[in-house]
């Protein structure tokens, strides 16, 4: 293993970046065009292969042979729903080779096929050459970053891309981890720090929450949108100008690919200008049918065109916080990554969401990931042990792990791609009165119902003292060590009685092929699962609203404050809805929502009147009850039909 300098490479979906640690600091290296980030584009022409800026600059003339977005294909199967959906938007051709996607291009007059990792390796070769030109010596070692949600196959294929490009890949590390390292957050003294990484790049948006303690990174949650980024903001501007061109010149340029591409390039430039100025001008000579297009756009107009997209970025932030079981006040550091976080409006929205907290943005957001990777590369070089280098590829759980709860629902305790070793505990309760025991069934998989997942093992916890349903508290703990061996235990809190099971990697676990298939299936079915989940939540929402409203108007405290007529109006409507619910347990989500709207139409005016007359209502607004514990069913023969476990919020 050569000991030359090691570089850190951020292999991005739309742009890549390379850095090196030398003379005690990180240097981000500019390419031959003077740009510190390089487009992740590879183009094939009848005479040459182009990589980076040169490839992106000629995409308008050569769309079918210019490959980008290879990162969206790497480590995936051709039939994967994600691949199938993306293919509809790509101008280049993707074919299946035994279920693996391959890219078909015409190069020097003949048809050629490449795997995604071969395209990524070409981008890596370019990044390697950029570093070599700057350092004046050959580079062999690199740390390459991947998104936190990449599975084992995507990580392995990224490593393969490095190998194909002639690099010895020291480590594959998560992008949010690299960004946190860039800011030295792992070096801050004191107790554990909760770090939120907000990464809005060219084509993807990722939010990650990490907990860092003593240099150990624990990934708590990830959320985001794999199809939101700078390109979407450009497209809004492009559509705005296509409409303006139509108004001014009565010509529609939308079908002319080259004109649209030239406009898009100008829009991307204008967007960058608007991050530092309040106005940008666009000047394109002979855009369409000889017409020159000279115009301008203000920052305010740009913000208005993208208002919904900007605001929408806060949803994944909230989801990541929920998944990490964290309140926004508990976040110590917020790190901005990705060029789109330079947009002032984006910064302001995020800062306001965190009640004015300072954001970490002193490192160029395009470069933060490569910066951290370079720091990691420097420290990895000192580590000769092959085991340690390879461990990083395997130190996550490839599939979610959980137990079956009421109604055959998969309740996840450990999400897929959680770094191991890890330990999670959750409290459950019984499903029926005087239930003597519970059956704990351990599953792995990504589907909403356990019947679609893989059963790893099961055990019973008996001798629970007789009690009404929902009273006993059973604490279930999943503990996975560094070798992937899992102990699942259940303890009855009142008696301290315990039982457990050990599940090793090989016994009952899935092979790599199976894991790939399952994760793909899960993505394919995710939409169905989400529809099912939404349906159940709409039904539960309607049910609790109706029951709460009923008990609210029947409350003794309201006597004399609500007329009998109003009271009966609400009760009749609630009873009508409850009886409709009994008959329609499997209705569609919109039917439940329609019923809820109808019910609200009756209730809201009356409740509002109450508020105005009384300045408030006992017990607050009836708006969906807080959930109780999730229930665990008894073992067969235990007086309940199968294992139905209820979760505790």
UniProtKB/Swiss-Prot annotation:
Stretches for region Nucleotide-binding domain (NBD): 2-386
Sample GO molecular function, one term: ATP binding
Gly residues bias locations: 616-627
InterPro entries: ATPase_NBD (IPR043129), Heat_shock_70_CS (IPR018181), HSP70_C_sf (IPR029048), HSP70_peptide-bd_sf (IPR029047), Hsp_70_fam (IPR013126)
Disulfide feature: none
UniProt key word Glycosyltransferase: no
Pfam families reported for this sequence: HSP70 (PF00012)
TM ranges: none
Keywords attached to this entry: ATP-binding, Nucleotide-binding, Stress response
Similarity field: Belongs to the heat shock protein 70 family.
Protein name: Heat shock cognate 71 kDa protein
Gene (UniProt): hsc70
């Amino acid at each position: 293993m050569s000991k030359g300098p090691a570089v850190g490479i951020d292999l991005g979906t739309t742009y890549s970046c390379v850095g090196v640690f030398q003379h005690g600091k990180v240097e981000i290296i500019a390419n031959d065009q003077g740009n510190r980030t390089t487009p992740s584009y590879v183009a094939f022409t009848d005479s040459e292969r182009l990589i980076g800026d040169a490839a992106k600059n000629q995409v308008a003339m050569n769309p079918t042979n210019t490959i980008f977005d290879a990162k969206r294909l790497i480590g995936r199967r051709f039939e994967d729903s994600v691949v199938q959906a993306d293919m509809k938007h790509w101008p280049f051709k993707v074919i299946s080779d035994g279920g693996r996607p391959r890219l078909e291009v015409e190069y020097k007059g003949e048809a050629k096929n490449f795997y995604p990792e071969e395209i990524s390796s070409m981008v890596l070769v370019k990044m390697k050459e950029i570093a070599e030109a700057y350092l004046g010596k050959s580079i062999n070692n690199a740390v390459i970053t991947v998104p936190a949600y990449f599975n084992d196959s995507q990580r392995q294929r990224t490593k393969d891309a490095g190998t194909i490009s002639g690099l010895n890949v020291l480590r594959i590390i998560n992008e949010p981890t690299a960004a946190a390292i860039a800011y030295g957050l792992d070096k801050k003294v004191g107790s554990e720090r909760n770090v939120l990484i907000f990464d809005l790049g060219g084509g993807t948006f990722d939010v990650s929450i990490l907990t860092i303690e003593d240099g150990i990174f624990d990934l708590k949650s990830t959320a985001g949108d794999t199809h939101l980024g700078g390109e979407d903001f450009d497209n809004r501007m492009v559509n705005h100008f296509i409409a303006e061109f139509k108004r001014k010149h009565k010509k529609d340029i939308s079908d002319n690919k080259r004109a649209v591409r030239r406009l898009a390039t100008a829009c991307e430039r204008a967007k960058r200008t608007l991050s530092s100025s309040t106005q940008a001008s666009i000047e394109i000579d002979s855009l369409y049918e000889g017409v020159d297009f000279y115009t301008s756009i203000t920052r305010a107009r740009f913000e208005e065109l993208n208002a919904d997209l900007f605001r929408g970025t806060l949803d994944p932030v909230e989801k990541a916080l929920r998944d990490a079981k964290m309140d926004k006040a508990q976040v110590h550091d917020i790190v901005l990554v990705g060029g789109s976080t330079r947009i002032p409006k984006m910064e302001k929205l995020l800062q306001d969401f965190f009640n004015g907290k300072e954001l970490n943005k002193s490192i160029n957001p395009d470069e933060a990931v490569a910066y951290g990777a370079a720091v990691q590369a420097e420290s990895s070089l000192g580590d000769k042990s092959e085991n340690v280098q390879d461990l990083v590829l395997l130190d996550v759980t490839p599939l979610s792990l959980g137990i079956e709860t009421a109604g055959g629902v998969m309740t996840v305790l450990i999400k897929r791609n959680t770094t191991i070793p890890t330990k999670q505990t959750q409290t459950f309760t019984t499903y029926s009165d005087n239930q003597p025991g519970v059956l704990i069934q351990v599953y792995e998989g990504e589907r909403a119902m356990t019947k679609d997942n893989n059963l790893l093992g099961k055990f019973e916890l008996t001798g629970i003292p007789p009690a009404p349903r929902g009273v006993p508290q059973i604490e279930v703990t999943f503990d996975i060590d560094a070798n992937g061996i899992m102990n699942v235990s259940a303890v009855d809190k009142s008696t301290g009685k315990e039982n457990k099971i050990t599940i090793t990697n090989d016994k009952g676990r899935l092979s790599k092929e199976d894991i790939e298939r399952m994760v793909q299936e899960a993505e394919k079915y995710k939409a169905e699962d989400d529809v099912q989940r939404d349906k159940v939540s709409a039904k539960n929402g309607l049910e609790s609203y109706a029951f709460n409203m009923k008990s609210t108007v029947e409350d003794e405290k309201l006597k004399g404050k609500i007329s009998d007529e109003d009271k009966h109006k609400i009760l009749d409507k609630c009873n009508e809805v409850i009886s409709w619910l009994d008959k329609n347990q499997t209705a569609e989500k919109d039917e439940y929502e329609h019923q809820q709207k109808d019910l609200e139409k009756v209730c809201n005016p009356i409740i509002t009147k109450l508020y105005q007359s009384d300045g408030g209502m006992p017990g607050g607004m009836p708006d969906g009850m807080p959930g109780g514990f999730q229930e665990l069913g008894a073992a067969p023969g235990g007086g309940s039909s199968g294992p139905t476990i209820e979760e505790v919020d």
